[in-house]
Amino acid sequence: MSDQLQMTDGMHIIVEALKQNNIDTIYGVVGIPVTDMARHAQAEGIRYIGFRHEQSAGYAAAASGFLTQKPGICLTVSAPGFLNGLTALANATVNGFPMIMISGSSDRAIVDLQQGDYEELDQMNAAKPYAKAAFRVNQPQDLGIALARAIRVSVSGRPGGVYLDLPANVLAATMEKDEALTTIVKVENPSPALLPCPKSVTSAISLLAKAERPLIILGKGAAYSQADEQLREFIESTQIPFLPMSMAKGILEDTHPLSAAAARSFALANADVVMLVGARLNWLLAHGKKGWAADTQFIQLDIEPQEIDSNRPIAVPVVGDIASSMQGMLAELKQNTFTTPLVWRDILNIHKQQNAQKMHEKLSTDTQPLNYFNALSAVRDVLRENQDIYLVNEGANTLDNARNIIDMYKPRRRLDCGTWGVMGIGMGYAIGASVTSGSPVVAIEGDSAFGFSGMEIETICRYNLPVTIVIFNNGGIYRGGGVDLSGAGAPSPTDLLHHARYDKLMDAFRGVGYNVTTTDELRHALTTGIQSRKPTIINVVIDPAAGTESGHITKLNPKQVAGN
């Protein structure tokens, strides 16, 4: 009598495929039909981080992808859970972060006839507009190839989010184990180098060499590329001033003498040749229009050819991955050496010094209650002594002011709201950065922004992660003290509960909480939080009148022209 065949099922196959592709962490929220999949993943040595909301789990996966160049994995249940995670999937795609959202779903035969299955929804077609690609698996023998495709799509070319739909009947379907193992695909070289055209590289160097006022703008694509050494060598060899976008801060330290960040407006308005490195001429750079010289010539290094000429004509497009492109630029530079004119660097330094003096006066002014400037000055002092930490930042005024005040010293240590300026990334990014790196994380949050994902502090405490959350509490969205135009005594649309004690939340979850009202108290609490590696909330009491509506982008907010 022949030996009985060993059988396996869909959820075991997908977990084995994850393992064979060196996926070591899953972020998610369990429930029907994926609970046993999470249990089995954990049993097989894959770390499972359980969240309170799928959106935050997705943000954590995306942050992991940005930091590692490997797709972060988010696991959700069907329909409502899938929809909760969809914002994070879309945000990953817009920002160019590799992420795979795996969701359980209902039986296709019932969904397609709209017969009212449990949590019935055509999830794959719902995901398509918001993902780089979306795949559905209809039989267990296709699970391996589906995951392989998802991995390759998520990291190749411009990275992005990929959706993988796993119906419950596929997860439960069985097949012979030995046969199942033959269906698993280990992805080799998932993101092959994309070499730029040599003529484009030569043209780029030639244009930069002729420039009188060149400028390099580093975007988060440059940070993602991990081409840190090549970028430093090129900038320091040519002495071209550079301007980092927010998540590119730290590729070269913000204190580097060639940083033009403190003279940003002047640099953008006066540069004659600008080289964009993994940066897009989108709203964050005024589409290359307002505040820019009309005759500025652009060089753009980007992996996505469709990005070229999106807002301004690009004189020299260099299409390829950033690392290969910069390697080519360095090789060409040896044949055509040049140095940026000293007069351009000198005039930038004059403007930097003038602006730095104005900022110093704001930072050193003692007020009671605290405002954004003196509070962030205290934070800056502490983080200067803790340069290995990861900084997560979201809010309106909290984001804008922290970006300008807090220096970064190492690459990929700053994560923030990104291209969409989305609120709610804070706790997910903080957890993703902490789990991925094992290092302390400081999340600087506006009180409104914190509310989007605040319950994830329980997740932080449950896993005992070294995350310190600094909440700038002025009692409102943008600012407190709004006016109720109805006269009925209701809260203003921009008001939050005044005098809230966010630090007390930690009493419920056995974390550490501080309520601070002075810069000395803030320095002490932040230093202690970082050094203790304990989950910590610091409630920073800020003047309700501090800040402006929508922070630095008030101009984007339409104003009513009639009525109250």
Where are these regions (language model features)?
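Active-site diphosphate/adenylate-binding microenvironment
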Residues: M11-V15, N22, V29-I32, M37-R39, ...
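A structural motif corresponding to the C-terminal end of an alpha-helix
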Residues: Y130, A378-Q387, M506-V512
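Generic enzyme active-site microenvironment
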Residues: Y163, Q300, V392, I444-E445
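Thiamine diphosphate
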Residues: I110-L121, S265-L268, W292, D309-N311, ...
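N-terminal alpha/beta PP-like core and its mobile active-site loop of ThDP/TPP-dependent enzymes
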Residues: S2-T339, V382, P466-I469, R501, ...
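Phosphate/pyrophosphate-binding active-site segments
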Residues: S2-L5, Q141, D295-G395, T519-T528, ...
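Conserved short loop/turn motifs at secondary-structure junctions
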Residues: G219-A223, S364-T365, G446-S448
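A glycine-rich phosphate-binding loop feature that marks nucleotide/adenosyl-phosphate handling sites
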Residues: D165-V170, A396-N397, D543
